[in-house]
Regions:
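Acidic two-metal-ion nuclease catalytic site recognized across multiple nuclease folds
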Residues: 1-5, 146, 157, 164-193
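Conserved beta-strand -> loop -> alpha-helix junction used to position metal-binding or nucleic-acid-contacting
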Residues: 112-126
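Short Asp/Glu-rich motifs
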Residues: 78, 125, 163
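Conserved non-catalytic scaffold segment of RNase H-like nuclease domains
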Residues: 1-109, 113-116, 131, 137-154
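Conserved glycosyltransferase catalytic-site signature
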Residues: 99, 121, 156-160
Length: 193
């Protein structure tokens, strides 16, 4: 596998995974959306051989099956290539699942969970658009509709790009940088902060 991620300095990288089954460690696709200082987005995705069985439910959800990953690299091989870039940046995930999956897959291969700096774009979306609570929510599916985002849901590269776009829209709407919006220690952020 050749990495298509420039060895560059990004504002942040959004990361999304798809899994083969209900086991969080069964990553079968990793997608990244690297956001440059001018807010251009470079998207990368790769299939991953989870070395596990696939559930029919997951295959229906993302369309990836055993035949697609047979010759794909394992998670440990992918992480070895991506670690130098990921470890230098804030990583955005849409919910806590992606971090859980990366940590679980790391443990499966016998190494500690990477000490990445994670920020949750759900938290950012909740702070930017609190009115969506109880009104469709802050999941990518509803944000796609509300923010008029164009992406194919349950493709890791597309979902990573969508999470990056959510963050960029929230920054523009609130006039506050993502790391202040997504900081769990901050109680509230407003357009006047």
């Amino acid at each position: 596998m050749h990495t298509m991620i420039p060895d560059d300095n990004f504002r942040f990288i959004a990361l999304d995974v798809e899994t083969a089954c209900s086991d969080a460690a069964s990553i079968c696709q990793i997608g990244l959306a690297c956001v440059w200082p001018d807010n251009r987005i470079h998207t990368f995705s790769t299939l991953v051989n989870p070395c596990s069985d696939f559930d029919a439910f997951n295959i229906r959800l993302h369309g990836i099956g055993p035949e697609h990953v047979r010759n794909a690299p394992r998670f440990d091989e992918v992480l070895d290539l991506l670690f130098p870039v990921l470890s230098r940046h804030h990583l955005v995930q849409h919910s806590n699942f992606d971090k859980q999956a990366v940590n679980a897959a790391s443990r499966t291969y016998g190494f500690d969970a990477p000490n990445f700096h994670w920020i949750d774009s759900v938290t950012i979306a909740r702070r930017a658009w609190p009115e969506l609570k109880g009104n469709g929510g802050h999941g990518l599916g509803n944000l796609k509709k509300v923010l008029k985002l164009d992406f194919h849901h349950h493709d890791a590269g597309e979902d990573a790009r969508a999470a990056a776009q959510v963050v960029l829209r929230a920054e523009a709407y609130l006039g506050v940088p993502f790391d202040r919006i997504g900081n769990p220690d901050r109680k509230a952020v407003s357009r006047h902060d």
